[in-house]
Every structure is written in structure tokens, then in C-alpha cells.
From Swiss-Prot:
Its EC number is 6.3.4.4. It catalyses: IMP + L-aspartate + GTP = N(6)-(1,2-dicarboxyethyl)-AMP + GDP + phosphate + 2 H(+). It comes from Chlorobium phaeobacteroides (strain DSM 266 / SMG 266 / 2430). This is Adenylosuccinate synthetase. Its cofactor is Mg(2+). The gene is purA. The active site is at residues 23, 51.
Length: 434
């Protein structure tokens, strides 16, 4: 006979994932949920993504620190899957402290997280410039080259900052190779090895109070009954394995990446909340079937303030794409949807939804992840009546405009996943729960 406890799930962790091309509004949801969880974890990416948070008439953009840092009872963790620019991280810590928030004792950084070095950033920009028309659209923050070194087993990790001899040896080995590349391939100035060794040796005492084995810490906290919220950067369609390759990021923003990027055991994951905008955006290059290259697309961008939080680049805009969303929901095992920026659609007479694609004369429902095929599809749209009014004062679904409710209900029926969170404005309180 099976033991009564044999199949009992252990579910104390929730993952928040972007289901589109990033920039879905994860910062607002994580900010709202942070005071309901004991620990908030960032599990992948680096300073190439920005989470925008609006509160107390302030707009704050975080690139590395988890959004929970603004909730005093919340512990924040930067996991092993994140690549860290030490100078950028310390600058972000300083800015948060200047706002009156305590960081020491509330922030833990994985000793296994890899570092972004100055040569990563320079090589990132040089490689992108050399691509010409084939540019990926990198932010130039050194993310890709840092991950390259990680998987080539040449990377420098946070723990190396605490060991001067190891740091010096790794820096000299890396710079010998990088300087040769800079000089012979790109014909650029080499880095001063001694100067960089001296600069990075000074991070030792500054970063030491934050560094720990976060894999063990998180699993022990979960075993003790603590709750954990995991926040990813970017979105599923930019995942290096599951996204629109090669126009992707260098890590795994998907829910599976939450485990590998934090060290949390999979059986602790109870919920996966998928975030999507009420429309769609993409920054940089790559196929975008529902893109609007007309006045409507411009209007979406202007109303939605669609400029990258990290680079300031203008985002491409289009209608929501249910083909892409169905794929993202499946890959991530999404249990509920958080719909953001519904207010951007408040002034539109009509709103369209991409429900399928046409490919070589046939209608398809499955999302092609290879860029060559995706770039050949054309969207099939269903047009709905807009609500032409604000929902900012609504706090329940019934208080929303009928046409807005119809829009949300249609998305639910098509996606077969409940929409439980609806952002009707940028503020913390401008939210409808179901």
C-alpha cells in the first residue's frame, strides 16, 4: 500500500515569468507580491533588463536587485544563474540605501554567480558592431560574453573576489586571451592587466558581507516553511533554448531556469505566474508577427512609454499574439496569468488580437521558434470593440468596463488559463484581482 505522505507535494515557491519578449511589467507584480513572501530571488540575466516600480510618486528601475528590496521584511537573493557587474550592483545598492532602505542583512548573493568584467562589455559591443545587418540587438552590457566564459569554464565568479590569489590568476589568464583578441581581431587597445587586478581586488571587503551559498540557504529556508518568490528577467520568447533563436538572450528566463538559476529543488515550485501585456512589444531585432508598423503601433508606443528601461531604445509594438502566448504558457507550465498595461488600450476604438498565423497558404496554431519560419508567417486577427474609458478606479472585475471585461474573458477562453491579476494603471493600487 502506498504511504499517505508518498505523493504529498512540497510547494512553497512561486515563479514569475515573462511570457512574451520581455518588458511585460514583472516589476509591478513582484513589488506587489514581495510583502507576501519571505524571500525574493532573481535567478537569471544581468543588468540587461530593468524592472520598473512605481510607488509614493516615484519611479524606480532596478537592474540587478530583486524588486523585494523595497519591502523591509523581505530577504532578497541574487542567484547563481545571474551574471553580475560588481560596480553596477554596488551602485544600485547605494541608490536604494539613499532612498532609506536597509540592504545589509537583507541581501544575499550566490558565491557561484559569474561576473561581468570590463572586457565582456567591450567585446559585446565590438562583436555586435561587426554583425552589420545581422545584429542581434544586444544591450552591450556584457551579458552574452560573460555567459560564454561561464559555459567555456573560464568565467570569474563572485567567490573569486574573496580569494585574491585565485582572482589574480584567473584575471591574468583571461586577459591574456581577451587582449590578444582585442589586438589581433578588432585592432583595439588592450586592457591593463595590473590595473584591473588592483581594481577588482578592492571589491573583496565591500561585497563579502553579502556572499553566501544561496543554494543551501534557499533549500533550508524552504524546508523550514519559508515562502519564496522567484523573478526572472526578459521573457520566454527570448529564452536561449525556447525562444526565437538566434534573436534571444543568453540565459533561461523560463520557469525551468528558476530551478537551475537558484538551486531550488523543482518539487518546491507550486505556482507559475505568467505575465503578459495586453498588447505586445519587442526591443531589438527578430521576427514579430503581430507588429504594427503604422500609426497604431506608434500610438501604442507613445501611450505605453515603450522605451527600454536599460538602454532607452524604442520598443516595437503590436497587438497581443495568442499563438505565441499559448506556446509560452505550455513551456512554462503557467498556472495563472497576470495581465499588465490594460490601461494603454483605454483610448482605442477597436482592439485586435492575433489568434492564428498563415504560413504558405495554411492556417496554423503552433508557434514556430525558428526565426526563418517565424519571419514568413502573417497574423490572423480578430477585432473587438474598445472600451474608450479608464478602468483605473476599478478594484474588482465587475467594476471594469463591459468591453474590457469581454477582452479579458476572451483571452482566458482562448488560452485556457485564468487571468487573476489585471493592471489598470501604473500605480501599486491600480490593480484588479480575481
Amino acid at each position: 500500500m502506498e504511504s499517505p505522505s508518498f505523493s504529498k507535494p512540497v510547494q512553497s515557491a512561486t515563479v514569475i515569468v515573462g511570457t512574451q519578449f520581455g518588458d511585460e511589467g514583472k516589476g509591478k507584480l513582484v513589488d506587489y507580491l514581495s510583502d507576501k513572501y519571505d524571500i525574493v530571488v532573481r535567478y537569471q540575466g544581468g543588468a540587461n533588463a530593468g524592472h520598473t516600480i512605481c510607488f509614493d510618486n516615484k519611479t524606480i528601475v532596478l537592474h540587478l536587485l530583486p524588486s523585494g528590496i523595497f519591502h523591509e521584511g523581505c530577504v532578497c537573493v541574487i542567484g547563481n544563474g545571474v551574471v553580475i557587474d560588481p560596480a553596477a550592483l554596488l551602485d544600485e545598492i547605494r541608490k536604494v540605501e539613499e532612498l532609506g532602505y536597509e540592504v545589509k542583512g537583507r541581501l544575499f548573493i550566490s558565491h557561484n554567480a559569474h561576473l561581468i568584467m570590463p572586457y565582456h562589455k567591450r567585446l559585446d559591443s565590438l562583436h555586435e558592431d561587426a554583425q552589420g545587418d545581422q545584429k542581434i540587438g544586444t544591450t552591450g552590457r556584457g551579458i552574452g560574453p560573460s555567459y560564454e566564459d561561464k559555459f567555456a569554464r573560464k568565467g570569474i565568479r563572485v567567490v573569486d573576489l574573496l580569494n585574491p590569489e585565485v582572482l589574480q590568476e584567473k584575471l591574468r589568464d583571461n586577459l591574456a586571451a581577451k587582449n590578444k583578441l582585442l589586438k589581433t581581431i578588432y585592432e583595439k587597445e588592450e586592457f591593463d592587466i595590473d590595473a584591473m587586478v588592483k581594481e577588482y581586488a578592492e571589491f573583496d571587503k565591500i561585497i563579502d558581507p553579502y556572499v553566501t551559498n544561496t543554494q543551501l540557504y534557499l533549500n533550508r529556508q524552504l524546508k523550514a516553511g519559508k515562502t519564496v518568490l522567484l523573478e526572472g528577467a526578459q521573457g520566454c520568447l527570448l529564452d536561449v533554448d525556447h525562444g526565437t533563436y538566434p534573436y534571444v538572450t543568453s540565459s533561461n528566463p523560463t520557469s525551468g531556469g528558476a530551478c537551475t538559476g537558484s538551486g531550488i529543488a523543482p518539487n518546491y515550485i507550486g505556482k507559475v505566474i505568467g505575465i503578459c501585456k495586453a498588447y505586445m512589444t519587442r526591443v531589438g531585432n527578430g521576427a514579430f508577427p503581430s507588429e504594427l508598423s503604422d500609426e497604431t503601433g506608434e500610438r501604442l508606443g507613445q501611450i505605453g512609454h515603450e522605451f527600454g528601461a536599460t538602454t532607452g531604445r524604442k520598443r516595437r509594438c503590436g497587438w497581443i499574439d495568442l499563438v505565441a502566448l499559448r506556446y509560452s504558457l505550455a513551456v512554462n507550465g503557467v498556472t495563472e496569468i497576470a495581465l499588465t498595461k490594460l490601461d494603454v488600450l483605454d483610448t482605442f476604438e477597436e482592439i485586435s488580437v492575433c489568434t492564428s498565423y498563415m504560413l504558405d497558404g495554411k492556417e496554423i496554431q503552433d508557434f514556430p521558434t525558428d526565426h526563418q519560419t517565424l519571419s514568413r508567417v502573417t497574423p490572423v486577427f480578430k477585432t473587438m470593440k474598445g472600451w474608450k474609458a479608464t478602468n483605473a478606479d476599478a478594484r474588482t472585475f465587475d467594476e471594469m468596463r463591459p468591453e474590457a471585461r469581454n477582452y479579458v474573458t476572451f483571452l482566458e477562453e482562448e488560452l485556457q488559463v485564468p487571468v487573476t491579476f489585471i493592471s489598470v494603471g501604473p500605480g501599486r493600487d491600480e490593480t484588479v484581482f480575481r
